[in-house]
Structure formats: C-alpha cells, structure tokens
C-alpha cells in the first residue's frame, strides 16, 4: 500500500494511471464511502476529456458517459445495484467494445468480469490522506509491465512506489 499524503498526490496518481490506460481497459475502484473513488475517477476523466469537463457522480443514475478523443469513458457506480444482471441494462455490453470502463463498487459484478482488470483500492485516513494499492492481473509481458514501469519510474512522487510482482501465470501486481 502506498500512502497518498494529500488530495494533490491522489490527483497525481490518478493522472499517472490515466496515462497508461487505453480503450478496453476496465478499472475497478474499491473502498468505503468517502474513500475517494469518485474523486479518483474524476481525475482520470479529466485527463482524457479536459480539465474543464463537467463531471457528475453516477451515484444516483448508476452510469455517466464521457466522450474522449477516440473512445467513450463509461463511469459506473454500482452501490445501489440489486443484482449483477442489472449491469446489462446499463449498456455494459456496449461499453466493452473499445471503451474505457471505470467501475465503483464493482464487487457485485466482479465474477462476470474477465481479465485483464486493474483494481484501485483506496482507504481514507485523516486529513485527506489515503492508502492506495493498484492491483493488475494482466498476463506477463503485457500491458502490466508497461504500467508497472510507468508508475514505478514516475518523477511525480518523492518516494519510490512500492510495487510487488506475483510470478503466477495471471499475475497480481500490487502498488
């Protein structure tokens, strides 16, 4: 786990992760209420759509979409989903076709998702501090390697990011 000491560091990490994302990526955001999932998504969306983009939390309507240059960002908040099948009523199959998907509260549908996935786990501490881990289960020598190298070599943080690699065929990589 990496400690993000301020809102600014959380923004930096979200934008850093965004730089490695591409169409067809699925990012799962986990954490309690107030952990910063929507804030993290907002920064990813701003990276692709511009700083002045009006970003609305999908808490009440479960889905917001944003047009990036060559794909759409589907931002889901599944907190109020009653059954996993409801995700299909929210355009999920369409979202899987060449778009970037951000899912808050993904636990209810996680069993429906196939790798590769990127999980961002956030835990609120005090004074805008967060604990954060990023886990990916990309296969070896795929996007995961470039994601890890990119995050680890970033000059945006004063300390080196703690990234652990699992050597299993479908690897979990933790920040």
Curated annotation (Swiss-Prot):
- Keyword vocabulary terms for this entry: ATP-binding, Cytoplasm, Magnesium, Metal-binding, Nucleotide-binding, tRNA processing
Gene Ontology annotations for the cellular component aspect, listed alphabetically: cytoplasm
Q: Where in the cell is it found?
A: Cytoplasm
In terms of InterPro entries, this protein maps to: P-loop_NTPase, T6A_TsaE
Residues that, per the record, bind Mg(2+): 38, 104
Q: Which domain of life is it from?
A: Bacteria
Which residues take part in binding ATP? 7, 34-39
Task performed by this protein: Required for the formation of a threonylcarbamoyl group on adenosine at position 37 (t(6)A37) in tRNAs that read codons beginning with adenine. Is involved in the transfer of the threonylcarbamoyl moiety of threonylcarbamoyl-AMP (TC-AMP) to the N6 group of A37, together with TsaD and TsaB. TsaE seems to play an indirect role in the t(6)A biosynthesis pathway, possibly in regulating the core enzymatic function of TsaD.
What this protein is called in its record is tRNA threonylcarbamoyladenosine biosynthesis protein TsaE
Per the UniProt entry, what species is this protein from, by scientific name?
Rickettsia conorii (strain ATCC VR-613 / Malish 7)
- Show the taxonomic lineage: Bacteria, Pseudomonadati, Pseudomonadota, Alphaproteobacteria, Rickettsiales
